[in-house]
Every structure is written in C-alpha cells, then in structure tokens.
Amino acid sequence: MLDVNLFDELRIGLATADDIRRWSHGEVKKPETINYRTLKPEKDGLFCERIFGPTRDWECACGKYKRVRYKGIVCERCGVEVTKSKVRRERMGHIELAAPVTHIWYFKGVPSRLGYLLDLAPKDLEKIIYFAANIITSVDEEARHTDQETLEADIFMEKKEVEADRDEELAERQQKLEEDLKELESNGAKADAKRKVQNAAEREMRHIRERAEREIDRLDEIWNTFIKLAPKQMIVDETIYSELVDRYEDYFTGGMGAEAIQTLIKNFDLEAEAEKLSEVIRDGKGQKQVRALKRLRVVAAFLRSGNDPAAMVLDAIPVIPPELRPMVQLDGGRFATSDLNDLYRRVINRNNRLKRMIDLGAPEIIVNNEKRMLQESVDALFDNGRRGRPVTGPGNRPLKSLSDLLKGKQGRFRQNLLGKRVDYSGRSVIIVGPQLKLHQCGLPKLMALELFKPFVMKRLVEKSYAQNIRSAKRMVERQRPEVWDVLEEAIAEHPVMLNRAPTLHRLGIQAFEPVLVEGKAIQLHPLACEAFNADFDGDQMAVHLPLSAEAQAEARVLMLASNNILSPASGKPLAMPRLDMVTGLYFLTLEKSEDQLGGEGAYHEADENGPKRGTYSSFAEALMARDRGVLGLQAPIEVRISHLRPPEDIEAELFPDGWQRGQKWTAHTTLGRIMFNELLPWNYPFVNGVMAKKAQAVIINDLAARYPMITVAQTVDKMKDAGFYWATRSCVTISMDDVLVLPNKEEILQRYEKQAATIEKKLARGKINNEERYRSLVDLWKECTDFVGESVEKIYPDDNPIPMIVKSGAAGNMRQIWTLAGMKGMVTNSRGDYITRPIKTSFREGLSVLEYFNNSHGSRKGLADTALRTADSGYLTRRLVDVAQDVIVREDDCGTRKGLEVDVAKPVLDAEGNETGEFTRAEFLETALIGRYLAKDAVNDNGDVIYERGAFVGDAEAKKMVAEGVRTATVRTVMMCETATGVCATCYGRSMATGQKVDIGEAVGIVAAQSIGEPGTQLTMRTFHQGGVGGDITGGLPRVQELFEARVPKNQAPIASTEGTIKLEDDGNFYTLTITPDNGEDEVVYEKLSKRQGLAVTQEPGGFEHQLRTGDHVVTGQPLLRGAPDPHEVLRVEGVTGVQKHLIEQVQKVYRDQGVAIHDKHIEIIVRQMLRRLTVVDSGSTELLPGSLIDRNEARAINKAVATNGGEGAAFRQEIMGITKASLATESWLSAASFQETTRVLTDAAINKRSDKLIGLKENVIIGKLIPAGTGISRYRNISVEPTEEARAQAFSMNTSYGDGFYGEDGAYGEFTGAAVRLDDQGFDGGFGDIS
C-alpha cells in the first residue's frame, strides 16, 4: 500500500487506453461471475482468480500450491499467483472493446468538453455518437480540386442522360396517347372517355417529369455537398451519405459513432486551434467572442496539462477489483451482488456479441446497432441515468453506477472517506452526575470494561493474575473480582472523549477523566450540558477512547472539559451555573431584613433600646450564630473579615498600598454572601450583591480573564456544588397555589372590550378601512395584555417561587408569568398575521375551545418551523465549513499595514445635542474591537497616541481608549491578511476560546463556520410583514443564507452611486429619482422606482426619521428604497471595503436580533473566502485567459513575476462569490468533489490535470493523512523533546540515604543521574557471597 506521508500532492488526469492496460492484470472476457455449484470464480470471468488473485490466502485455484512457502509462484495449471487474498482489493482487470466508445462525462457533462473541443453542438454530437448521423472526418482537398472538372463533367453527363431518358419516355407516352385517342375515335367513344384517357396520360407524363427533376436535384445536391464537403460536417441523410461514399469515397473519409469522433480528435491540432481562438478573442465581439473564450479554456487545458484528448474516447475500459464489487451468498442459497457486476456483465455481453458479428461480417446496420448498444452499456456503467432512461434492476430500481458510488451523502467521499466509524467506542443514555468534578464523567462499569478490554488484559498478564492473553480474556469475560481492580488502574489518568450528536461546534466533543459508576448510563457533569446542548430527558452520548500517547495528551491538554470553559464564538463562558444552581446561588445571596430563622442575630444600629447588635468579629462567629439558630442566612450583619480581599473601593480607601492576606476590614453584608465569596479565589475582590444569573456570568467572565483556567474550573465546580446545596434548601417549588390571579381582571377587560367595539363600529360606518382596523385592534389588545401583565407582576410578593425563578435568571421570563396568571394575549396565524381576537384567559384559568384552537395555529407553525430550520441550518453549516476549511493560522505576522476601521467611542451629548467632552462605548465594541491588534496608532481628538500600532486591545485597553476619547481605531483583520495560504496570528488576534493570541496551526476557518452555523437553529425562518408598504423583508436564517450566497435579494433596494442632493418626480406607480452630485459631475437618474416598495427612511440630525424627499442629501451606498441592497451592486459602488462592511453588519444584525453573540472575526473569515477570487479582464503579458477566475494571492504573484521580467501585468476585476460557488472554485479538487457536483468537478480536474497540494483539512482527511492543523502542522511534526537540566534533576532526585557499608557512602558513585551503572566498572564481579 502507498504511504500517505510519502507524497505532498495528488494529481488527477485522463487515463489513456495504454494506462488502463498497464494497470490491468488481465482481460475479462466472460460475463460469468462464480460457478453456481462449486461457488468458485469462473475463469476469465468478472471474479477470475488468474486476473484478480486468489480467493484464499497463499492458495492457488486448483489447490496444487498451498501454504506461504510457495509465495510468489504462479501455478502452471491454473495460472493463479500464490499470494494473499487481500490483493483482490487492489488488482484491476480490463475489457478490450470491439469498438471505441466515448466517455459520457466528457460528452454529456455541462458544458460538453468534447463539444467545445471539436466545435460541435451537443445535440449533433449525440446524433453522431449514437449512430443517427454521419460526420466527415477528413477531405482530400487537393485531389478533389484536381479532379473537379472531370467529376463535374461526369455529373453533367449523368444529368444529360437523365434528361434524355425523360424526353424519350415522354415521347413514347405521347405517342401511346395519340394511338389511344385514335382508337377511341374510331370506336366512336364519347368526349368524356377521351378526356379521361387524356388526363391519365398527362398525369403520367407529369410524374415522369417530376421524377427526372428529383433525380437531377439529387445529383445537384450530391455534387454541391461534395464540393463543399469539409471535416466535421454532419450529414444526417443516410441515402446522400451512401451516394457520396459510392461515388467519391477516394476523396474523403467519414463515419458515425465514437470511432468517427476518435478520428477527429486524432487529426485535431491543439496549438493551431488555440492560436485561431486567441485571434477571435482579440478581434471578435459578442457571442462569437464568448464562445471562443469557452472553447479556448478547454483547448488550453489540454495543451497545458499534456493530457491526450483522445483519452476521452475509450478502446478499453478498466474493471475495478472484485472485492470492491462483492458477491455474497444469502441464507437460502441466493446471492446478493453489487450493481456494478450487472453493469459490467451487460458491457461484456454486448462486446462479445459485437466481436462475433464483426467476425461473421454482418451487415453494417446490424453492426452499428450493436455498437450503439455497447456505447449505451458503457454509459450506464460510468454514469447510469445521465442520458436517457436509467438501466434498472429488480423492482425497477436504477442500478448504482461508478459515478453514483462517489456522489452524495451515501457516496464514497462523504460516507467512507470523510465520515468513518471508529473502534473503541460505545454509546448510552446520559444522566446527571452532580458529584463529579468538571473534568470527570461517570462511565458505566460494563462499558468501561469493554472499552478498556485490551488494557485490562495486558495488566492482568503483567500482574500475573493470568498466564497469557487468552486466559486474561477469559477472566475479563467472566468478570472476575480482580478484573475490577485492574480496570480502576487502567482508566486512571486515561481520558475518554464524549460526543453528543448533533456536533454543531467543537465543544460537541470534549474529553473527561472517567470515573467508574454502577448502572448502565453515562454520568455527565451538569456544567458541561450547555456546551453539548444536552439535557437528561433521554439524550444519548457516544464515548470514544484515545489510544496513542499523543492522542491522550491532546485530549487532556486541548479537549479536557475544564480547559474549554469559554465559547469559541464569543469568548463568553459556557460552563456556567444554570437552572437549579442559579436559583440556589440567588437564594444564598438574597438579603432580607427579617430572616425566617429569627432575626435576633441580624444587624441593628445602636438606638435608645441599646447598643448596635448583629456585629461579628469573624466569619466563624457568624457561622456559629447561625448554627445556634440565632442568625439567618439572609439577615444583614456587620462582620470583620481577614481571609477575603475587600471590594476595590474599600481596598483603595483602607489599603492604599494593596491589601495583604490577614489584614482586617469590616463588611456590611449577609452570611450567605460571605459563603458565596468563599467559593471564589481568596484574592478576588469581595462581591457584595444579589447573584442573579447575569451577575454570575460577569464574575466568571472576569475570573476567566484574570486567573488560569484550572482556577476558573475549580471555582465553577464549587459554585455548582453550592448552587445545588442551597437550591435544595431554598424549597423553591411551583404549585397551582403559587400562581396568583388578578382580582380586577374582568374590569380591565371590559374597558378594553368597549374600545374594541368602538373600532368595529368605525369600520361598519366606513370611517376606517380594514387595514386601519387591523392595526388599531392589534395595538389595543397588545396594550391590554401589557397592562394586565404589569398588574399581575405587582401582586406577586418577593418570596413567591415563580418570580424568584425568573428574577434569578434560572429559567423563563416575566411574559411567561403574564401568560400563566394574566392573559395569553394576541396570537398569530400560520401566515404570521395577528388574529384580532385575543386570548383573554390565562393558563391558570384555562382556555376556552375557540381560544385553544386559535392558539394552536401559531404553536403548530412554530413546531414545523423548528424542523425545517434544523435541516436548513445544518446545510448552511456544511457550506460554511467547506468554504473555510483551509483557513488555518500559518504564521505569526504577515506584516500588512492595512486594517479595518471600527468605532470605539461616541461622545456624550447634552440636552441641546452638543458634545459634553465625555465619551461612552460604541455600540458593538465587544464584537468589533476587543481581541485584536491595532493596524495604526490609536489617536484621540487632541492627537495624543493612546496605543501604538501593533498593540493588543483587550477589555482594559478598550476601556482606556473610550475614556481617552478615541473615536475610531484601525485594527488588523483577516480580510486584509496577506499570508499566502491561510491567515496570520496577528491579523486574527485573540482566540476567543483561550483569551490568548491564537496559536499557529489553529483551524480558525472551521471554528468560524461552527460559530456562525451553531446558533443557526435559533434563528427564525420567518419573513417579516411590513404592512403592505415594503412588501416582505427577509429575516432570520433565510437572510443569512442570502447574504453568504451573495444572492440578489427579493425586493432589492437600489443604492446611491454618488454623494449628492436628490430630486423626486412622481410617475404614476413609480418614482424617478435624480441625484445631483456634490462634486459637480453629471446627474445620476434612477427610473421606475417602485412605489409599492416604498422609499427608504433617512435619519435627521435630531434622531427623527422620515422617508426620502426632494432636497435630502444622500451618501454613496445609501439605499434609495426599502429592502436590502444587492451585494454585487455594493461591491461595484463602494468597492471591497464597502461590501465587506455591508456583509458583516447585515449578518450580525440577524444574529443580534436573536440575542446571539458572535465575534466579527468569524464572519470576516467567511467574507474573506467570498472575496478571494478575481476575474481576469485583460491578460497583458501573462498566460492567463480573459474571463477566468484566479485567486487573489496567485494573481499578485503572477503580476509580480511578469513585472520583474519587464512585461505588462494582467488586469483583474474583484468578484464576490457565494459560499457554494466559492467552495466549488477552490484549488483543491478533492475538497470540491467531496462537497457537491462531484462528477463535474472531477471531469474538470481531470482535463486540467489538476494537482491537489493538500493544503486544506478535507483533502488530508480524505487520503488519511494527519490534518495540517493543530499538532498535525508540519512545524510541530518532528519535534524531539530535550529535558532541561532542572527537569532532569527533578525527575531523578532521590532523597533516600543508605549510608551503609554494603552500598558505600552517599556520593560514592557521584551525583545520581538515573542512568544504569555497569557493576564490573565499580569492581563488582557478581561475587556477593553465598546469599542462601
């Protein structure tokens, strides 16, 4: 087998017949497969052992040679080589065809490569190949010219003869007529009879004239056809062709079928054709030039690649190894076989029949029919169903051809090469494991024993529990008691990987240290649920075992759950307390002035009744008071603390030089809050407040920024334990009695009912139209719902469990409480329009039948939407991954000085709208600025340089930039990165998952695709209605797809191509809009702007909005109508930077509307890939073809090289490609073929003899190589670790001191190094005396 590590690129080309014969181990001559009695392969058949190798290891077919000692011998009796049966997976055969056939991919593909090469229309080509027309392959122009006069004279003579014959026949007929008339006259016949005879004679004479005329016309046609005869001329009329052959076969050759095509290709001069086409492209125009360009692409591909175009017509076809198209016996003696065997059988049958016919000298028409059938059977083998009806098997099922084996989800690429099943894995239901640490998971004993079986067996032998592996295996299978002890040792420090499908982002697989548990369910840490999106309602998870030391190290260092606390999409913590844990911590940190457990221990100021109470000298004393039942958990107290760091304000006041552990300070807090702070690192500033979910998130975010991951992991683990502990003790439960109903709800409803009746009356009287009624009712009932809801909120006491759950942030929101206790309110129908009758009851009261029916509309729509969304979102993720899979961090810094301008601070305005001199953060600072490097100095209004170019901007730096008044900053971005392949670490900035600068080798493209695709399911599917004005506005997932596919949006909005003042004119259903540019250039006129779509809205300085009107000022790129601009138009008007900003803003808008945080850099990576390609406009001195696509970096390199040699560089136009198109246009043919349109990609790659440089991830996965990312990157491959002196000393330090005479004093053998010492060097000869 070929070692994948021995080559760096993979090339695909066209195989010629000689190549096919060279690969082959013999010709398959018979259609038989195996003998039905002996079940042995038939000789020369599709499973022949002589061709493909023996079916049994080291045994020939006849049994003369058996055993490995005869290895390599070819049996003289049966001709089978003695070798391993595995060769039946590798050895190919071939079928010698009796007539050439064309390869269907090159003829039927779009565009038809054969058609472009030979300049024939695909329809004509089809007629020739399938024997419906003849084609002229060559003409002897010279001989024809020489003999033209003679031949013309011959034709002239022939015509004369035809005319003479005609005249003779007419004369005879005339004579006969006269005689007949005479006879009739003599017999006294009537005039009627004479007329009949006369008419009949005239009719006959007319036929004679017409026949002669036809004959002369035919001769003229034959002659004219012959005179104009040229190669590649098609003759459909069979009779004319046979006449031409009969008369002039010495002057031309022609034919039909693939044979004629083969002759044409062999006579084809590629270089001359390329020159001719280049001339047409230079001088031509319009359609002619376009076609010449397309043809030149195919001709140039053959010229450049050195492929032989004749290879598109096959004289022999390969037969793939039999093990790849197996035949297996079923119970009952029947056989199941691969479809390919049927298809090969058809080819062989027809081929043999054709050979026999040719040998017998059968008539041409029969032979041609058989050749056509052979061509069709080879077509079916290569790509069944591509032309005509597919060949079907039993049950009318189309047979799977070679192309079908590669295509689609079940094809070779996606099913077997990109997605393999792996050994050492198991799956089971998951349950919660609250007792686990974050880096642990509970593994059922039986599953662990099965997974670690080999490790356990090895240890059993090592520990002498078993003599050999076989007995160890028996012990394991019988589950002897010692097996469990050994299993404990085997799993120690050996991480396992847990995966939950669907794996939407990289945190869908994480590593954990296994802990053995009883039962059969896997136990999962509660904090890991968020990342896996797991819950415990029957979800299943898969366990995988990393085997090699490297795999274990990577699992532990990179994938361990405690190292993956932050989300790679936004940098926010994912391992966060949720649900019950949040409630518990919220309950713990509440403050109640009078606590349930008695308030004597609570803090009271000194008053006339006595001194102040509730002050404690330490946390321990306060705890003791609680244990005695004097102090409540949530009662306010004053306490002196020395083991926890004070809040920042107190520290600044009391300890200007910084607080040291042990220094005392006084806190006004509650016991619960001190307990909460005990969970945090001791040197984290004391947090004195109620810990709702958002506050907890802020703390964990801060911890992640300040402390190592291990500390954060330990802290969240403690928070988890405390959360569950106090949630249990908080007694938060929900019962029907906790849902309080509004006492005066009926009155409120009656008030609004009256207003609704008034609106209905207005409609009946014609004061308002239907549209206005709808809007008024919707607004009215929404107001009613809100009023009822807010009233409900007020009647709930603080200690009611329902608002407590909501306020803590554990689950739900206030609207759900309104629905429970107030009223459900407005619901939508399946079209998304509101039903104007609201649901007036709450779930506590129960819905009426009609209300329930109305409610079910929208709910059902929601469920259907979710199902559709999941599939759509998955497909979007797949396309994103495909387009970005080769974006890997390749170097530290590309050195570019370009960057993207982002807003940092905006001025604070006073009541009059003037700047106050203070600044506040720009709106999207987190996702745009933080985590990047500066491309230019950050300067404020005074010109002070706050941070220099190259500085990193984290949270603290961003804060300072805002405070100093830096309005905008130019940051490094992947879109401007100049790294040849992939991106550089400086342009990418901080890895969101680690908070550090991204490592070289990080597959940032995949992370970006997952970050955008993973929240895809949360996006809505809906189109927003704009009440008829702007039609529908696409939102949610469809909008994201529209943007990433660079589609022209529905209801496209034209954009201003220049800056200036507008003038509007009304033209009935349309507007005409004229822009007068500020720079004095010609006016720009936009005609036929739809009124239905509506004019765009513009903002006035005061923040008010209005529709565009005459006199308004517009800037370049501003939309003129409602709707979304076309990205291609934005690129044309605003250039690359404009379209980059447009795409990022628009995608972010959709995600922000759903409350999803994604850093801009992820979207930028996808946008970079969309703008990677340029179109060649003018080739200059380069070899490039106008109209061809080229990678931006490659274009830069080519122009640089040409300029060095003094040539003229090519001119390019920037293209924006949708992600699907961009994936298919990738340099890697393996990656493109495994994505979509497999046959088209492979056809194109083969003609161009494409070479895949194996740069991306997919192509390396496909060929089974380590991916060039992470630890698989070349620079990390051959690292050898040299221990430092300190490490060596640490590893081998030994503190034991023997100090006895036998071993000598310490130091007698020098410093201890851990190296073995030869005893005879030390004077020992092994004579230790008699030890017995």
From Swiss-Prot:
Coiled-coil region(s): none
Positions bound to Mg(2+): 535, 537, 539
Gene3D superfamilies cross-referenced by the UniProt entry: 1.10.132.30, 1.10.150.390, 1.10.1790.20, 1.10.40.90, 2.40.40.20, 2.40.50.100, RNA polymerase II, clamp domain (4.10.860.120), RNA polymerase Rpb1, domain 3 (1.10.274.100)
S-S bonds: none
Top-level taxonomic group: Bacteria
Main EC class the enzyme belongs to: transferase
Binding site for Zn(2+) 2: 894, 977, 984, 987
GO biological process, one term: DNA-templated transcription
Keywords noted in UniProt: DNA-directed RNA polymerase, Magnesium, Metal-binding, Nucleotidyltransferase, Transcription, Transferase, Zinc
Gene designation per UniProt: rpoC
Cofactor(s) needed by this chain: Mg(2+); Zn(2+)
EC number: 2.7.7.6
Subunit structure as annotated in this protein's UniProt entry: The RNAP catalytic core consists of 2 alpha, 1 beta, 1 beta' and 1 omega subunit. When a sigma factor is associated with the core the holoenzyme is formed, which can initiate transcription.
Entry's family note: Belongs to the RNA polymerase beta' chain family.
Catalyzed reactions per annotation: RNA(n) + a ribonucleoside 5'-triphosphate = RNA(n+1) + diphosphate
Protein name listed in UniProt: DNA-directed RNA polymerase subunit beta'
Cofactor: how bound: Binds 1 Mg(2+) ion per subunit.
GO molecular function annotations of the record: DNA binding; DNA-directed RNA polymerase activity; magnesium ion binding; zinc ion binding
Residues reported to bind Zn(2+) 1: 60, 62, 75, 78
Cited function: DNA-dependent RNA polymerase catalyzes the transcription of DNA into RNA using the four ribonucleoside triphosphates as substrates.
SMART domains with a match to the protein in the record: RPOLA_N
Classification via HAMAP family: RNApol_bact_RpoC
GO CC list: DNA-directed RNA polymerase complex
PANTHER family tied to this protein: DNA-DIRECTED RNA POLYMERASE (PTHR19376), DNA-DIRECTED RNA POLYMERASE SUBUNIT BETA (PTHR19376:SF54)
